A protein has these predicted regions:
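Residues in well-ordered beta-strands of folded domains
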Residues: 16, 228, 249
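Extracellular Cys-Trp
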Residues: 1-108, 112
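Long, charged, glycine-rich C-terminal linkers/tails
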Residues: 223-242
Length: 277
């Protein structure tokens, strides 16, 4: 798998190993590979896992493969019913991720999207978007992506966070934020190849900075950015060693995971009845 770029010109961006991912050893190995490839490893809880086991699995006394805080892993529960019987939710998530990438873009979340081909779930879960204590939302609070099935909704993927949540509060705990960062970092690194070994001068620096700014300015996946030399370095010393330190900042678009409303009943609009007379 690590030879994908050498052979095909591209690395895998989603790693899924159905059934084998039920052990912590395999899940850990998936996350290691995902870290090398700048990918996301999708791992599912074993078949037969109960809700309580899934939640406990995130803690030190857990007995399943969910004891991780990796920013390269995403955890899924429960198994779903499909054409082949019980099927891994992680497998369906991988397919949905690719479908979403192609049809909307890599910065769109797979959460709250219909799971095609899914006709049931191994474990029934209460699901209400406006109830923080519903079982689907309780799973999300523990960094577990699940299935939302409420009245008239069908079966939908539900959850945005990577396994590093809730330990890590940085926005990179959103899967889409991590993937946006991966695309940007990889694109800039590959672009910079054409500048390697050219003379360090104003023309090189201006071209580098200008081109990166132009690239970031075309992205629909971010809401803002900045690019400059990295002044945390001693630039004269860096240039003398053949190094050109750059620093770019960006803010990815994040999913609207919760929409809150403040409902206020007031008498003040009764004045409209008077003003209209």
């Amino acid at each position: 798998m690590t030879e994908g770029f050498t052979r095909q010109g591209a690395d895998a961006k989603i790693i899924v190993v159905p059934e084998y991912d039920k052990t912590a050893t395999v899940r850990g190995a998936m996350e290691v590979v995902a870290g090398k490839l700048k990918a996301i490893a999708y791992a599912a809880a074993p078949k037969g896992t109960t809700l309580s086991k899934a939640l406990e699995g995130r803690g030190p006394l857990g007995s399943i493969n969910f004891q991780t805080s990796s920013d390269r892993g995403q955890l899924f529960f429960p198994y779903v019913t499909g054409l082949l019987g019980l099927e891994s939710l992680a497998t369906h998530a991988a397919g949905l991720r690719m479908k979403t990438d192609v049809e909307q873009g890599y910065w769109f979340s797979i959460s709250n999207r219909e799971l095609l081909g899914v006709t049931g779930v191994e474990i029934g879960l209460t699901a209400r978007a406006d109830d923080p204590q519903s079982e689907t939302n309780r799973l999300n609070e523990k960094g577990i992506t699940t299935v939302f099935n409420s009245y008239g909704t069908g079966y939908r993927m539900w959850g945005n966070r990577l396994a590093c949540f809730p330990t890590v509060s940085h926005i990179k705990n959103f899967e889409v934020a991590q993937r946006v960062g991966d695309v940007i970092d990889e694109s800039i690194r590959r672009f910079e190849l054409q500048y390697i070994d050219r003379p360090i001068d104003d023309a090189l620096i201006d071209s580098l900075l200008g081109s990166i700014r132009t690239y970031l300015g075309t992205l629909q996946s971010i809401v803002g950015y900045s690019v400059d030399l990295d002044y945390d370095y001693d630039l004269v010393d860096a240039f003398s060693k053949g190094q050109v330190p750059l620093k770019y900042e960006y803010t990815p678009k994040l999913p609207a995971e919760r929409i809150s409303n403040a409902s206020v009943m007031t008498r003040k609009y009764l004045a409209n009845l008077v003003s209209q007379r």
